[in-house]
Structure formats: structure tokens, C-alpha cells
């Protein structure tokens, strides 16, 4: 099922051509351009209080284009700022954390054209909206995906992997059950995993996950689900040990 906010294609047009995905790229590009213009309009029309944007300036853009696309367009715009424009280190660091593709031919069309102070304020509102969702990220991970074998561990799915409508902690936590991608030294990428919230079993790629969850952040509901999933294997291990002793 497609996202209600439309596709967000994060690779170059050249890559899209190679994989016969130009229609996806074209639609994503069109929406990115519309989003950038909507941000400019929201800033331009915002009621001013001491020259600051209204507290809900970003709301209409986020509701129409989604947080994921809005962050993508804003991050791209920060990276497109010339060296003579001094964005704060915090904003630059934030923009680096969001994958965008440098594009000298098409990127200028969805670069937000506004005063730096207003751009920073709009980014602040967008980040607040994102943070209010309470999603897991690298900060809650004890290990990365290339530190050790992750089979049998609870993995944190990257928000960028999920459709925005599925953004929730319940959809982020998966128990890795197998696949060559579990081994950081393995050549394969596939990881087979079970969703803790609903028991769905499916295949993902190693890069779809941020890392191994630090279990101090494991919610109570997830602890119960995890115990239920691990119980049969623990019982099998006990039975095997008993058989060995007999």
C-alpha cells in the first residue's frame, strides 16, 4: 500500500533510470518541489510576534506533506546553503543525519528560499513534531548492525524504512531470527525477523535497521512479547540438555 503522502525517492534520477523507477522519482520530485513552495508560503504568511514565526507555522505543511518529506526538503535546503551562510552547528549536524542526494541539476528546485532565521525556526518546529512521536533511533541502541551477530536480539528499525503512517515504537521493534545479514562478516544482507507487537514474520535487509536495542529501553509490552517468543526455544534447549544427560 502506498503512503498517503506519496513516494519519497531518496536516490538520484540516474539511479531511478537504472532501476526503471523514473515514475517514482518524478512523482517524488514533484511533491518535493510543492513541499518547498508550501514551506515558503507558510513562512511568508505566518503572523509575526517579535519577528518570530507563529508556533504552529509548520503544522499545515506537516499535515499535507508529512514529517518525513518535510524533513527531507529542509535537510536538503540546509546542505544547499552556500559557504558564506553560517547555519548553526546543531542544524548542520541535524541535516547530516538525514540522507539526501546532491543534485546540481534538479536540487535547486526544491531548495527552500527564505531567511536563515526563519528556516531555522521552521526546522525547530518540524523537529519538535518528530520528537513528539517518541521513536527509537541510534541513541537507544547498544550495538550497531556491524558490531556482532544480531541473531536472537531485538533490533530497532529505522524510521526511514517505514511508511510515515506506520511510525510507532510498536512497528520498530523486531526479533532477529536468522539470515546471512545477522552476521556482520557475512556476505548476505537478508535478516529474517519477527515483529514484537503483532508477530509478523518477514525478511528485511541489514541496512533497514539502526542497531540492537539497549534492553533498558525495552517497553513493558515488548518484554512480555519477547518472553513469549523466546520461551519455546528456551524449552527446546532445556529438553536437549536433558536428553544429553540421559
Regions found by a protein language model. Give the residues of each.
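Gram-negative host-targeted secretion-system effectors, predominantly Type III and Type IV
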Residues: 1-246
Amino acid at each position: 500500500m502506498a503512503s498517503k503522502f506519496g513516494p519519497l525517492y531518496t536516490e538520484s534520477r540516474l539511479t531511478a533510470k537504472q532501476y526503471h523507477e523514473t515514475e517514482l522519482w518524478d512523482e517524488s520530485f514533484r511533491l518535493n518541489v510543492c513541499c518547498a513552495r508550501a514551506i515558503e508560503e507558510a513562512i511568508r504568511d505566518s503572523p509575526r510576534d517579535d519577528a518570530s514565526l507563529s508556533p504552529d507555522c509548520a503544522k499545515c505543511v506537516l499535515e499535507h506533506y508529512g514529517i518525513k518529506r518535510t524533513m527531507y526538503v529542509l535537510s536538503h535546503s540546509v546542505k544547499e546553503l552556500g559557504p558564506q551562510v553560517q547555519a548553526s552547528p546543531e542544524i548542520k549536524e541535524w541535516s547530516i543525519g538525514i540522507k539526501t542526494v546532491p543534485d546540481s541539476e534538479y536540487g535547486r528546485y526544491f531548495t527552500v528560499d527564505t531567511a536563515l532565521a526563519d528556516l531555522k525556526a521552521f526546522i525547530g518546529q518540524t523537529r519538535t513534531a518528530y520528537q513528539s512521536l517518541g521513536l527509537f533511533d541510534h541513541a537507544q541502541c547498544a550495538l550497531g548492525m556491524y558490531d556482532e551477530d544480531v541473531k536472537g536480539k531485538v533490533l530497532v528499525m529505522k524510521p526511514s524504512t517505514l511508511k510515515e503512517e506506520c511510525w510507532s515504537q510498536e512497528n520498530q521493534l523486531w526479533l532477529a531470527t536468522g539470515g546471512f545479514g545477522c552476521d556482520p562478516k557475512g556476505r548476505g544482507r537478508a535478516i529474517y525477523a519477527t515483529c514484537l507487537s503483532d508477530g509478523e514474520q518477514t525478511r528485511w535487509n541489514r541496512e533497514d535497521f539502526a542497531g540492537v536495542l539497549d534492553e533498558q529501553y525495552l517497553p513493558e509490552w515488548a518484554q512480555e512479547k519477547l518472553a513469549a517468543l523466546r520461551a519455546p526455544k528456551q524449552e527446546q534447549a532445556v529438553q536437549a540438555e536433558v536428553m544429553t544427560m540421559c
